[in-house]
């Protein structure tokens, strides 16, 4: 078997020298390999290049598909191995840099706080303890809110009872006479309209009254007043009733009213008038 005579660079006069061997050996020189790499790069890389396309692009006589197939396969394997090595080296570098960064952070944390190492050792218990602490705090706040609500409710109930007792005492202290269900309704209406009767409406209704305020008992510090109204005759014939000392008559059913005569230390005296008859 005869070998290919490469001459100086593996090819002579633009082509590879031929032999009678169907599978002649070829020494891939640096120049020949560079031309192969240029052809593969022009075709889009080793994955896209084919032996036939490389053969046409190189255009060397004596270069067969057998030579290009084997060389292209070796070239692809070499590129894959190079990529793998680059990936492994890059991963090692990334791992080393991350380890160094973590080491620096951990050392800085320990230098700032000596208890960091204990927390790192008990890292499994830290989240559970933190959650328990938050839960206990939430329960305490909830209990405090319940206590505040209970106190407010008790105060509201006490105020309601106090108002009810005041209304009952006021109702008992007022003489209602032969009061029935209608009198009770009038009493409730009177409680609602009491402030209005004491206000400007009372002044308009009693526009004909003459008020005379004078000081009685000059040496005494307490002031007494007397209101005298115009007297009119009672047309209905109702008897004049003088209420007991210390009470004011507020019966809404009576046709005649009462004027306040004297309010001293020992009681209240009133006299009837017919303002109610005029208003009715």
Swiss-Prot record:
Major location (coarse): nucleus
Segments for region (Coiled coil): 129-149
Stretch forming the signal peptide: none
Name of encoding gene: PHL11
Keywords: Coiled coil, DNA-binding, Nucleus, Transcription, Transcription regulation
Protein name in the entry: Myb family transcription factor PHL11
Segments forming domain HTH myb-type: 20-80
Pfam family, one: Myb_CC_LHEQLE
MF (Gene Ontology): DNA binding; DNA-binding transcription factor activity
Motif (LHEQLE): 142-147
Subcellular location: Nucleus
Family affiliation: Belongs to the MYB-CC family.
Entry's Gene Ontology cellular component terms: nucleus
Organism whose genome encodes this protein: Arabidopsis thaliana (Mouse-ear cress)
Region entry Disordered, spans: 77-98
InterPro entries (UniProt xref): Homeodomain-like_sf (IPR009057), Myb_CC_LHEQLE (IPR025756), Myb_dom (IPR017930), Myb_dom_plants (IPR006447), PHR1-like (IPR046955), SANT/Myb (IPR001005)
NCBIfam families cross-referenced by the UniProt entry: myb_SHAQKYF
GO biological process: regulation of DNA-templated transcription; regulation of phenylpropanoid metabolic process
Origin: domain of life: Eukaryota
């Amino acid at each position: 078997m005869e070998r290919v005579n490469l001459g100086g660079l593996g090819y002579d006069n633009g082509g590879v020298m031929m032999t009678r061997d169907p599978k002649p050996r070829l020494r891939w020189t640096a120049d020949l390999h560079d031309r192969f790499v240029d052809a593969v790069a022009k075709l889009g890389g080793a994955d896209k290049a084919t032996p036939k396309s490389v053969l046409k692009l190189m255009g060397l006589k004596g270069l067969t598909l057998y030579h290009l197939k084997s060389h292209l396969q070796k070239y692809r394997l070499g590129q894959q191995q190079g990529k793998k090595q680059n990936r492994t080296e890059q991963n090692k570098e990334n791992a080393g840099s991350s380890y160094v960064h973590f080491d620096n952070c951990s050392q800085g944390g320990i230098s700032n706080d000596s208890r960091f190492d204990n927390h790192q050792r008990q890292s499994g218990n830290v989240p559970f303890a933190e959650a328990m602490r938050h839960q206990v705090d939430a329960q305490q706040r909830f209990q405090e809110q319940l206590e505040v609500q209970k106190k407010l409710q008790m105060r509201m109930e006490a105020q309601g009872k106090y108002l009810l007792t005041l209304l009952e005492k006021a109702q008992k202290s007022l003489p209602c006479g032969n009061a029935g269900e209608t009198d009770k309704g009038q009493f409730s209406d009177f409680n609602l309209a009491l402030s209005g009767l004491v206000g400007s409406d009372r002044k308009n209704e009693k526009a004909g009254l003459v008020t005379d305020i004078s000081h009685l008992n000059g040496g005494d510090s307490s002031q007494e007043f007397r209101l005298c109204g115009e007297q009119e005759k009672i047309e209905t014939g109702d008897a004049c009733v003088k209420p007991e000392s210390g009470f004011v008559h507020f019966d809404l059913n009576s046709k005649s009213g009462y004027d306040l005569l004297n309010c001293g230390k020992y009681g209240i005296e009133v006299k009837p008038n017919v303002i109610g008859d005029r208003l009715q």
